[in-house]
C-alpha cells in the first residue's frame, strides 16, 4: 500500500521499497496476548530498559563520578542500545524471546557489552594521544598476531554490510560487531 501511495504522489523510488517483517517477539513468560493483558507497551519497555541500565550501571560502578545529567544520558544510551541490539542480533525471519534482564548485561552478546568495549577503546586512544603517540604514522608499528587478526576481521566489514543488505538481515552486522569486540 505504501509503495502505491508513494508512487501516486510522484515518488518513483516507492516501487523499490521492500516490506521488512519480523518474527514474533515473545517474553520469557510466554507469548504476548492482548486478550490476557500480556502485551508490553513499547514506551513502557523503553522506560524499563533505561531504568534497568541505570541500576546495573550503578551496581557495577560505571556511573561513579558522573553528574546526574551524565548518568541519565548514559542510562538512556545503554538501555535503548540494549533493546535495539537484542532485536537486531536475531535474524528478522525468526521468532525471538526478549529477556530484558539478559539484554542489559555488560557481558556476552549484548548491546551494553559492545558499548562498553567501544568506550574502553576510545579511552585507550584518548590516553595514547595524551601520552604523545601519533595516530597517523604507523610506519614503525609491527602488529602482533592478535592485532593482525583484528585488522583482518575489520577488513571483512564491507562484505558483511553488502551481504546484510542483499539478504535484508541486519543480524549479520550485529553479530559481526559482537565477534569483532570479542577479539579486542
Task: Please tell me what each predicted stretch does.
Residues 1-184:
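Non-catalytic interaction-recognition regions
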Amino acid at each position: 500500500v505504501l509503495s502505491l501511495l508513494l508512487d501516486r504522489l510522484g515518488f518513483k523510488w516507492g516501487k523499490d521499497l521492500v516490506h521488512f517483517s519480523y518474527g514474533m517477539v515473545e517474553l520469557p513468560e510466554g507469548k504476548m496476548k492482548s486478550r490476557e493483558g500480556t502485551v508490553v507497551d513499547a514506551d513502557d519497555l523503553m522506560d524499563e530498559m533505561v531504568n534497568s541500565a541505570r541500576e546495573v550501571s550503578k551496581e557495577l560502578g560505571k556511573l561513579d563520578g558522573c553528574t546526574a545529567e551524565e548518568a541519565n544520558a548514559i542510562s538512556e544510551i545503554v538501555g535503548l542500545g540494549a533493546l535495539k541490539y537484542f532485536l537486531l542480533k536475531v535474524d528478522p525471519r525468526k521468532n525471538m524471546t526478549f529477556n530484558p534482564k539478559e539484554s542489559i548485561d555488560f557481558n556476552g552478546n549484548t548491546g551494553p557489552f559492545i558499548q562498553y568495549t567501544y568506550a574502553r577503546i576510545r579511552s585507550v586512544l584518548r590516553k595514547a594521544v595524551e601520552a604523545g603517540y601519533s595516530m597517523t604514522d604507523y610506519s614503525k608499528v609491527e602488529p602482533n598476531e592478535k592485532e593482525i587478526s583484528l585488522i583482518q576481521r575489520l577488513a571483512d566489514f564491507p562484505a558483511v554490510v553488502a551481504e546484510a543488505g542483499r539478504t535484508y538481515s541486519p543480524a549479520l552486522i550485529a553479530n559481526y560487531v559482537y565477534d569483532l569486540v570479542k577479539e579486542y
